A protein has these predicted regions:
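Acidic, Ser/Thr-rich low-complexity intrinsically disordered segments
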Residues: 181-222
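FMN-binding flavodoxin-like domain, especially the glycine-rich phosphate-binding loop
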Residues: 2, 6-13, 20-33, 42-51, ...
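Iron-sulfur cluster-binding cysteine motifs and their immediate structural context
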Residues: 205, 211, 215-236, 240-242, ...
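Short acidic active-site motifs
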Residues: 35-37
């Protein structure tokens, strides 16, 4: 089974692509986190996690899900199940994978899973919350998607073959796109992101452009937007916002802004013609 979280569709596409190769069942973390999150593993069944990097860290919703997830085994004396993790990012992931490994080990399911395959795939940029950060050009977007397709074909083969390395690190660790200064970006910068930049407070709507279609409320993965068809969006400020920018990117009239930081910036989500799937 593969558990995934996605805001603008990159990780959803990656998870679906892998599931087609591996024949694994897909579960949206944003949907199942509202349940008791209990699943039974079959003999030899593997578990995968696919999600984007947020501020060079694991998204809060994924961390909460790991704590809530309960896995049972049909075997009386079960062996550890194979586990893989794939992260999507616009550029680098820094120490996000190390942090995921730590989060996993700190949960009850960590005793049942053996993280033996990891990967990071570069996808079109969607973070627009800081000056100088914008979506990619159409040419760059296409280039990244084509490279990602090739990467996922190879990663899917490794999942099926249950590849391992003799080293103490999971297979694929050395190829992760950690970038320069990984500790700096994941620890002090990532901490700054979580404390000050992951918030819904700057979001606002331009009433002259808003057509009250309700798309923004529908695509919010944490139900942080009050509204719907016939209503302007109202952010709840309940500290659940992930700042994934799904609401901003999916607005068909570019009526949503994030303070002044998104003025004249572009929009992006993976599949522009199937809005309802990108949650």
């Amino acid at each position: 089974m593969i558990f995934y979280f996605s805001g603008t569709g990159n990780s959803q596409w990656a998870a679906k692509t892998l599931a087609l190769q591996t024949q694994d069942e897909l579960y949206s973390i944003a949907k199942i986190i509202k349940t008791d999150c209990t699943f039974q593993l079959k003999k030899g069944e593997q578990v995968g996690f696919v999600f984007p990097v947020h501020g060079w860290r694991v998204p809060r919703i994924v961390r909460v899900f790991l704590q809530k997830l309960k896995l049972t085994d049909e075997e009386v004396q079960p062996l550890k199940h194979h586990c893989f993790c794939l992260m999507t990012a616009g550029d680098t992931i820094a120490q996000a994978m190390e942090r995921f490994q730590q989060h996993l080990h700190e949960t009850p399911i960590g005793r049942m899973l053996e993280l033996d395959l990891v990967g990071s795939v570069i996808m079109p940029e969607s973070y627009v919350g800081l000056p100088g950060m914008d979506v990619d050009t159409k040419e760059k977007e296409l280039e990244k998607k084509q490279a990602a397709e090739i990467y996922l074909r190879d990663f899917g083969k490794k999942i099926i073959q249950k590849q391992k390395e003799d080293d103490y690190k999971p297979c694929g660790w050395k190829e992760l796109t950690v970038g320069p200064l990984p500790w700096f970006f994941s620890v002090p910068v990532g901490g700054f992101f979580e404390r000050f930049l992951i918030t819904d407070k700057p979001f606002h709507v331009d009433s002259q452009r808003c057509v009250k279609c309700g798309i923004c409320a529908n695509v919010c993965p944490v139900a942080d937007i009050k509204g719907g068809l016939g209503y302007e969006p109202e952010w709840l400020h309940n500290k659940k916002c992930l700042t994934c920018f799904a609401c901003y990117h999916h607005c068909p009239h570019h009526a949503i802004e994030y303070g002044k930081r998104t003025v004249k910036k572009g929009q992006y989500f993976y599949n522009r013609y199937k809005v309802k799937e990108n949650i």
